Design a protein with these regions (language model features):
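Active-site nucleotide/adenylate-binding loops and adjacent lid/helix of ATP-dependent enzymes
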Residues: 1-54, 65-69, 93-106
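Non-transmembrane alpha-helical segments in soluble domains
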Residues: 109, 170-173
């Protein structure tokens, strides 16, 4: 791990290879913190180490048909670090974006194409850089973070339903059964935000 830190510098992120959310994820800012991490007993859990990326998280959430085309698209924005919220026991905040930014949509669709995704609900996460980075790019650039072949977790599908005036459970079933939406008209609900511990 010291060789990796010498290459990318501090801070670094360490997280379980098979983790959920930001549980047991750490931002190490010094050699002392790195040594303390290595002295902990994590009961055989394997960790991966990543370079810290300064950014806010945006997601691309979509239902893809059998041709790999989106039949429904939305996303969310997490302006406060989930890792900091978990580790500091702070509140977390995110909101559904009814109309996702063009660059997030383009990145999501490019990932779908690259991975050959068909007939799936996807939840892809991206960083939007909050500052210039030597080799990742300029502030505002979209950088890939995570690929999931499933809906976003927790109550997010219900938030999507509210924010987008839809029923993603029915939309997902429509994709499986008919490869298209058999959309009903739902009353407009407009927006949905989550704030909590």
């Amino acid at each position: 791990s010291l060789a990796f830190v010498e290459k990318v510098g501090y801070p670094v992120i360490v997280k379980p290879d098979n983790g959920v959310g930001a549980t047991t994820t750490y931002k190490l800012k010094s050699e002392d913190e790195l040594r303390a991490f290595h002295e902990e007993d994590f009961h055989g859990v394997q960790f991966i180490m990543e370079e810290f990326v300064p950014g806010e998280i945006y997601s691309y959430d979509a239902i893809m048909n059998s041709k790999g085309e989106p039949i429904f698209e939305t996303g969310n924005h997490t302006p406060i670090s989930i890792m900091d919220s978990v580790n500091n026991h702070d509140d977390s905040v995110f909101y559904i974006e009814k109309h996702i930014a063009d660059d997030v949509r383009a990145a999501g669709r490019a990932a779908v194409k690259s991975f050959g995704v068909k007939s799936r609900f996807v939840h892809f996460e991206f960083f939007r850089l909050t500052e210039d980075h030597d080799y990742l790019g300029k502030k505002g650039k979209i950088i890939g973070l995570e690929v999931n072949y499933r809906p976003s977790g927790g109550f997010t599908p219900d938030m999507i339903n509210y924010a987008c005036s839809t029923d993603v459970y029915k939309d997902w079933a429509d994709m499986v059964a008919f490869d298209r939406l058999t959309k009903e008209e739902y009353p407009d609900k407009y927006y949905c935000v989550s704030a909590g511990c």
